């Protein structure tokens, strides 16, 4: 097969991040220099982001049987690159105090970003599996990066074992789907499934196993047990990546899979997904009520956010608006999570043992870091879905899609879940304004707003507010990001 210049341009983000991985590897082999490797990584990710403009000029195409580059792939590639950039930015001050090798951190983030970009354009079950593994394997190392702390090491072992089990379920499910249909490409699967094959037990078993594997990666109930422990044990910058890039990339590819394969037409699959969404929304919110650790709280809340997204996925067959709802919701979730985890990262930098993740560490923060407290408040309000924030626009879309598809019981779950969520998000926000304790145990640096991480957090807060009041630019971008059918 000959590769044309157009195909090379379409693959630019993938090639640039791949090249950055090689350059950073050689740089580490040549001389360990934390600043140099961090700069190379950030430059590579920025170059990949800029290259999306050229990809857009190039038009949509199938580059190989495995990868399809279209507006949809570009949107999710952009979101993954933004999350990876923020992760590297938050990691730099955190790693400054880290005693062991610092440079490999960036290498692992870049490899995981490579997996995310591959997933955004995946058009084949082989690409889906490769992408998921490329994201998961570096995360085993990243979650346990602070391995001298028992909690980080424990989180890494839990995540590794459960992730391996989930991958085997996913692979076995794919094998059963292949045995039944004789195809692995999304489009070919869609064609063969359209011929009333959705009642075959072997195919339903394969889809069931794939839902188990993907449910683990997306931390949906009942495959969520690793989530709070891993979010708490992982370093704050890694939790940022886990909550944003990996979830966005995997949900993006699941959405494409469901779009091409009319799986939603099967009543059995719809009921199973509906029950998973309902359980994730209610359980995630109820468990977050009693948490006193911010990272654990955000872990449980991420379970409920993916439950909300699942409502749009189930409604996918009933209209175009579901794609739009998911795009807007994920963008809002990305910026809100970057801000919230960014504040935790700033409070925990440089590395001094455990992160500043207990709710008590944030009590009275307003009285000596007013702007940082305002940012955290905006993020909590956005995650809760309060009007005038981007989180509200996303939640409104999900509710509209649910109503349009007549999923009344799931719409009720979203409303009840949001009401419960309001309590624990406001609990975090209110604690920032209480009287400060006599002795501060953790605090952000006094010049935090001039650091790269501080700038990322401030930009996230600004985007959440501006796009919450005037969401049209974001909605226009998401509407352009249509998958090639």
Swiss-Prot record:
GO molecular function, one term: quinone binding
EC number: 7.1.1.-
Catalytic activity: a quinone + NADH + 5 H(+)(in) = a quinol + NAD(+) + 4 H(+)(out)
Swiss-Prot/TrEMBL keywords: Cell inner membrane, Cell membrane, Membrane, NAD, Quinone, Translocase, Transmembrane, Transmembrane helix, Transport, Ubiquinone
Entry membrane topology: Multi-pass membrane protein
Principal subcellular localisation of the protein: membrane
One GO location term (cellular component): plasma membrane
Compartment(s) where it occurs, according to its Swiss-Prot or TrEMBL record: Cell inner membrane
Family the entry assigns: Belongs to the complex I subunit 2 family.
Protein name as it appears in the record: NADH-quinone oxidoreductase subunit N
Record organism: Klebsiella pneumoniae subsp. pneumoniae (strain ATCC 700721 / MGH 78578)
């Amino acid at each position: 097969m000959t590769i044309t210049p157009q195909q090379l341009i379409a693959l630019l983000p993938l090639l640039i991040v791949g090249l950055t991985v090689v350059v950073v590897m050689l740089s580490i082999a040549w001389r360990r220099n934390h600043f140099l490797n961090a700069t190379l990584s950030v430059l590579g990710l920025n170059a990949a982001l800029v290259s999306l403009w050229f990809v857009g000029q190039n038009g949509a195409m199938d580059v190989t049987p495995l990868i399809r580059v279209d507006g949809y792939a570009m949107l999710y590639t952009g979101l993954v690159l933004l999350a990876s950039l923020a992760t590297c930015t938050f990691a730099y001050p955190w790693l400054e105090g880290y005693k062991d090798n610092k440079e490999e951190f960036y290498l692992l983030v870049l490899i995981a970003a490579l997996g995310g970009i591959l997933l955004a354009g995946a058009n084949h079950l082989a690409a889906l599996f490769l992408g998921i593994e490329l994201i998961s394997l570096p995360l085993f190392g990243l979650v346990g990066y602070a391995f001298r702390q028992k909690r980080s090491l424990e989180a890494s072992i839990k995540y590794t074992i459960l992730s391996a089990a989930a991958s085997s379920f996913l692979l076995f499910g794919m094998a059963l789907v292949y045995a039944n249909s004789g195809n692995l490409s999304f489009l070919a699967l869609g064609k063969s499934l359209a011929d009333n094959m959705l009642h075959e037990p072997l195919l339903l078993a394969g889809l069931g196993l794939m839902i188990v594997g993907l449910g683990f990666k997306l931390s949906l109930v009942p495959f969520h047990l690793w989530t709070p422990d891993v979010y708490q044990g992982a370093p704050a910058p890694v939790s940022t990546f886990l909550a944003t890039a990996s979830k966005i990339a995997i949900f993006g590819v699941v959405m494409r899979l469901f779009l091409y394969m009319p799986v939603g037409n099967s009543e059995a699959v719809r009921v199973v997904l509906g029950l998973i969404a309902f359980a994730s929304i209610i359980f995630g919110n109820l468990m977050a009520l009693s948490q006193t650790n911010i990272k654990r709280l955000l872990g449980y809340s991420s379970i409920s956010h993916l439950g909300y997204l699942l409502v749009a996925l189930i409604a996918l067959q009933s209209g175009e608006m579901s794609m739009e709802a998911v795009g807007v919701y994920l963008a809002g979730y990305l910026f809100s999570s970057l801000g919230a985890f960014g504040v935790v990262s700033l409070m925990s930098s440089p590395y001094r043992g455990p992160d500043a993740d207990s709710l008590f560490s944030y009590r009275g923060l307003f009285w000596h870091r007013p702007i940082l407290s305002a940012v955290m408040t905006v993020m909590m309000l956005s995650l809760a879905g309060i009007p005038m924030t981007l989180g509200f626009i996303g939640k409104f879309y999900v509710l509209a899609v649910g109503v349009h598809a007549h999923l009344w019981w799931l719409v009720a779950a979203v409303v009840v879940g949001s009401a419960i969520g309001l309590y624990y998000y406001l609990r975090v926000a209110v604690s920032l304004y209480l009287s400060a304790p006599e002795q501060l145990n953790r605090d952000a640096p006094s010049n935090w707003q001039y650091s790269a991480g501080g700038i990322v957090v401030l930009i996230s807060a600004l985007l959440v507010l501006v796009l919450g009041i005037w969401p049209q630019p974001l909605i226009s971008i998401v509407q352009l990001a249509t998958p090639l059918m």
